């Protein structure tokens, strides 16, 4: 894509996948705070002029390539695998089929294995259902949902994000992008009283709070570069790597030039649940750890390492 044909991403949202903020927000003060944070994000989306809400959900795991929801009117009733006692989640989502099919084509052009999902009754995952029910309850804005491939590593995930940028630029659509993922994902393996919910361990809480500092400072690319360390420290090894920051950085732009805001951070059955927003800033690229440009055309070095040197 040419430099003049950049996608317009209004802001990004990072939110947790578990159903408590949707189904039982009053069971715990923390769940209520997460629900209030979702509601604030919903308000911001409603006040924006977004054309599409794009969801990358870590609870929609794929094995063969990358799947893209393309059914124009996705209607079903979902029950969460773990928290089925909280009740059913009936949903009806308006999917941007034009975007979905173009996203498949652009993913394949970049060398990825991709396919659309377009049939009645396909089981949309908990994280996507929770996010879209809370962020876009009236289907005011069409959405599209992308899977998270269990085996993809950094390069493949980055390319997926760039395929998103290709598609948004190609169609001229303004987007709000949503990553659905826990921070730490260790959960209690027995029933707990929701009123006594807490982060699974002190180590998990310490790492979560450091990650939140980075998000609050808008340091998205720094988090992307640290993803393997994060995965090794606070993530159950269910998949190859912790991918949300890779995808979000590749989609929004691989730099630290964002205004970050942590709206809520609470425990969800032991895991770290946070609602965060990242808005592209209008200032300079900055001077944070990985503040090199994501170069498409070479025009000489920026000499960032010379900053602050004595004459």
For every predicted segment, state its role.
Residues 51-57, 173-183:
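Beta-strand elements within well-structured catalytic alpha/beta cores of enzymes
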Residues 180-192:
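A structural signal for small-residue-enriched, beta-sheet-centric alpha/beta enzyme cores
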Residues 1-51, 62-159, 190-311:
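Flexible, D/E/H-enriched segments
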Residues 162-170, 175:
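Non-transmembrane, aqueous-exposed alpha-helical and coiled segments at domain scale
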């Amino acid at each position: 894509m040419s430099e003049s044909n950049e996608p317009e991403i209004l802001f990004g949202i990072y939110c947790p996948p578990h159903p408590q903020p949707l189904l039982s927000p009053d069971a715990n003060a923390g769940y209520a705070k997460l629900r209030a944070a979702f509601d604030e994000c919903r308000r911001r989306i409603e006040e924006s002029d977004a054309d599409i809400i794009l969801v990358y959900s870590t609870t929609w795991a794929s094995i063969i390539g990358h799947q893209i929801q393309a059914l124009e009117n996705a209607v079903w009733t979902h029950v969460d695998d773990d928290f089925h006692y909280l009740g059913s989640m009936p949903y009806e989502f308006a999917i941007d089929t034009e975007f979905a099919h173009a996203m498949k084509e652009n993913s394949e052009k970049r060398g990825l294995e991709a396919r659309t999902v377009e049939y009645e009754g396909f089981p949309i995952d908990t994280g996507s259902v929770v996010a879209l029910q809370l962020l876009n309850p009236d289907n005011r804005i069409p959405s599209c949902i992308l899977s998270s491939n269990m085996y993809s590593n950094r390069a493949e995930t980055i390319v997926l994000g760039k395929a998103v940028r290709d598609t948004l630029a190609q169609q001229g659509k303004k987007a709000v992008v949503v990553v659905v993922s826990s921070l730490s994902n260790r959960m209690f393996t027995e029933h707990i009283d929701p009123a006594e919910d807490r982060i699974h361990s002190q180590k998990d809480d310490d790492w979560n709070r450091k990650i939140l500092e980075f998000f609050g400072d808008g340091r998205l690319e720094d988090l992307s570069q640290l993803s393997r360390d994060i995965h090794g420290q606070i993530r159950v090894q269910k998949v190859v790597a912790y991918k949300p920051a890779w995808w979000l950085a590749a989609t929004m732009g691989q730099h630290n030039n964002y205004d970050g805001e942590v709206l809520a951070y609470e425990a969800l059955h032991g895991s770290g649940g946070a609602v965060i927003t990242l808005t592209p800033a209008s200032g300079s690229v900055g001077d944070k750890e990985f503040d090199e440009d994501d170069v498409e055309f070479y025009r000489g070095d920026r000499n960032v390492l010379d900053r602050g040197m004595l004459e």
